[in-house]
Amino acid sequence: MKKRLLACILLLTLAVLPAAARADVVAPGQKPPEPAEETAAFAELYADDLVDFDPAYTDALEGPVETALWLYPGAAEPLRTLTVEGYPANELGPCYVDSAGQFWGYTGYIYGNRFVWICLSDPTGTSVESDQAVIDRVETRVTELETAQRTQLILAAVLVAAVVAVTLVLILKLRRRMR
């Protein structure tokens, strides 16, 4: 009886649970998740090199495959690995061919992981070599973006402080006139 009651409460809770509380749903007005800074920097730097999906890799993720997920092609190490089975590789995109000729596919979501790259030439990632030139470019761009964000934050703080100071001066002048 207690198990049945607990199951009913659990089902009712899941049915009533607001969409915004679930990680896989973006509610209206909610800011959607964004890729990691490194992933976004890679996409920006290599936007002209992105290609369409190659049908030769359609079955790359068919059987149970231990798959390495990467922040970007050429990264020093994979973000994590997971077992993928029957995932439609042709839904990956955009794609990228690295300097070693390996074919990469991008996905916004795969089994709880967001914004990752998969090397379709070698899903396990055993033969994937890090590309120091790519790493250097991506890290430099991430640093530039972080510096720009910091500068914007400092500028906003200075502007707010200036508005507060001007408002304080005006209030003090108004008080002196009223006396």
Give the positions of each predicted feature.
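SH3/SH3-like beta-barrel superfamily modules
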Residues: 83-123
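Short, Lys/Arg-rich N-terminal segment immediately upstream of the first membrane anchor
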Residues: 1, 145-147, 178-179
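Cross-kingdom Sec-pathway N-terminal secretion signals
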Residues: 1-73, 92-93
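SH3/SH3-like (including bacterial SH3b) beta-barrel domains
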Residues: 72-86
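C-terminal membrane-anchoring or membrane-association module
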Residues: 163-179
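Short, mixed charged/polar active-site loops
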Residues: 113-115, 160-163
